[in-house]
Amino acid sequence: MPAMDVLLANPRGFCAGVDRAIEIVKRAIETLGAPIYVRHEVVHNRFVVDDLKQRGAIFVEELDEVPDDATVIFSAHGVSQAVRQEAERRGLRVFDATCPLVTKVHFEVARHCRAGRDVVLIGHAGHPEVEGTMGQWSRERGAGTIYLVEDIEQVATLDVRQPDNLAYTTQTTLSVDDTMGIIEALRARYPAMQGPRHDDICYATQNRQDAVRDLARQCDLVLVVGSPNSSNSNRLSELARRDGVESYLIDNASEIDPAWIVGKQHIGLTAGASAPQVLVDGVLARLRELGAAGVSELEGEPESMVFALPKELRLRLVS
């Protein structure tokens, strides 16, 4: 039997928004001292969150868990206007680690709200990004309504108030194919519906989904490194399975079941946008222990995007 090899997806792992969010927490701790409070997990990865806890970050779900006069960081997923207003009312020092591509969606929702349009948000109920985006809507600013649609079946039962004054936005980490199907169904039902000037699904989500499909065409098993609460990581594993390949989402190398690789010749390996390279390296080491002989990296879409840090943290680092 030929030796088992490993194919690495490209790109994989951290995106620009995740890099920025983690760096904001690290620099805030370095420059202001611990503890620094973070509302929600700054990114959805257990390893990253545990590392930041050891450095002095305290993760909370609501601002009432943050003491007066403390510093709080908003996670990469974004927050509602109500959360921002509460932080301002209490005089908390805030650093905003919201991904700029999520902020773009927030601006779209606020713009439609001011214009009095109805808005359909395509996303997963309960996800913090969706909660933050829904929370950009204010009835005080406009006469429209915001609706959440999770799947194509819900389009058939959707009943908007203003079908001729309607727009849509999306969560940034969705399956590209599923989202396009929902948008097509919405357009068929509401032909006058407006869309964003540019796709709301972020470049990193698109690139990693394209890369995992490239893997699936060449492998008989795909492992995705990412935490169970990571939306984009879950989508990667789903896509591989949808393309007919056995796939598992794992937090780290310890979760690999040796039975998975029995009889497999080509193992594909990728990582969600919130999973660090050190976890990928650990999985590679474990696969070598289990008999993997060679490792190669597929060609993929180059990524060079960098998002600026908050000005105060940049200045503090220089000084």
UniProtKB/Swiss-Prot annotation:
Its EC number is 1.17.7.4. GO terms for molecular function: 4 iron, 4 sulfur cluster binding; 4-hydroxy-3-methylbut-2-enyl diphosphate reductase activity; metal ion binding. Keywords: 4Fe-4S, Iron, Iron-sulfur, Isoprene biosynthesis, Metal-binding, Oxidoreductase. It catalyses: isopentenyl diphosphate + 2 oxidized [2Fe-2S]-[ferredoxin] + H2O = (2E)-4-hydroxy-3-methylbut-2-enyl diphosphate + 2 reduced [2Fe-2S]-[ferredoxin] + 2 H(+); dimethylallyl diphosphate + 2 oxidized [2Fe-2S]-[ferredoxin] + H2O = (2E)-4-hydroxy-3-methylbut-2-enyl diphosphate + 2 reduced [2Fe-2S]-[ferredoxin] + 2 H(+). Binds 1 [4Fe-4S] cluster per subunit. Its cofactor is [4Fe-4S] cluster. One of its GO terms (biological process) is dimethylallyl diphosphate biosynthetic process. Signal peptide: none annotated. [4Fe-4S] cluster binds at C15, C99, C202. This is 4-hydroxy-3-methylbut-2-enyl diphosphate reductase. It comes from Xanthomonas euvesicatoria pv. vesicatoria (strain 85-10) (Xanthomonas campestris pv. vesicatoria). The lineage of its organism: Bacteria, Pseudomonadati, Pseudomonadota, Gammaproteobacteria, Lysobacterales. The gene is ispH.
